[in-house]
Amino acid sequence: MKNKIWNETVKNNFNNASANYLSYSNIQKHFAEKIVSFLKDLNIQKGECIDLGSGTGLLADEIEREFSTKNITRIDFSKKMLLQNKDSSKKILWDLNNGLPPSIRNCPLMTSNFCIHWLDNPEKIIRDWFNKLKSGGYLIISYPTINSFQEWKQTCQETNIEYSGLTFPVTKDIVKSFNSDEIFFSKKYLYIENFPDVYKLFRSIVNVGAQTNKCKRNKVCELRAIQKFWPKTATNSVNLTWEINIEILKKS
């Protein structure tokens, strides 16, 4: 029951952010472009290519721009996010916590950008996705790791305020069911966002619908303390550091 309530809250927040998502999703755009740069060096077979947790179609559009012969099927559980995709694209409204739609199998390529940390059991789900690839097919995922948001966590420790951000996946857990020869590529990247203050930092998270967490909302006095003790740059602004992992998995 708790998971059901959580998933509904996640979906509602993404629905509410859908209209303005593209204006605020700089980190998602950055790693969508990076995924496309890797695709240029891979021999992707013919067949239906899938973007899982596609949101507004940011990654799918990037792939189609670079590879004009590819039409990417977009799967997401947020109806309003899917409605932001171009009309001509194939879209499937589906909760990925329930596996993949029955029609999805023998795919040459599956991608997922900033999605798996919202799923109930990402390790199992990723393995299921991998099993639906055709031989020689690729699964490419990008996701924030548990090492993200060190400034936030440090500030919460210093102020004795509960950390209210997401707990992101541990990379070794995500790939623990894969053999070394199935892990084609794995690399972590740091990405730093900068904001005038923590209030705008937290607003940026809301702007992309990513504010869902399992903690109580911070009180005003707690937010003030976080603003006061968050490490400052030379210009008195604040940074938020992400660690993003990109995994390319290949089915033999």
Language-model regions, residue ranges each:
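N-terminal, positively charged/glycine-rich alpha-helical extensions of SAM-dependent methyltransferases
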Residues: 1-18
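Class I SAM-dependent methyltransferase SAM/SAH-binding core
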Residues: 50-100
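Conserved alpha-helix/loop element of class I SAM-dependent methyltransferases that forms part
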Residues: 26-46
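A short SAM/SAH-binding and catalytic strip from SAM-dependent methyltransferases
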Residues: 108-122
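A short glycine-rich, Lys/Arg-flanked "PGG" loop and its adjoining helix->strand segment in the class I
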Residues: 123-135
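Conserved catalytic/acceptor-binding region of the Class I
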Residues: 136-197, 211-220
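Conserved Class I S-adenosyl-L-methionine
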Residues: 24-27, 56-58, 185-252
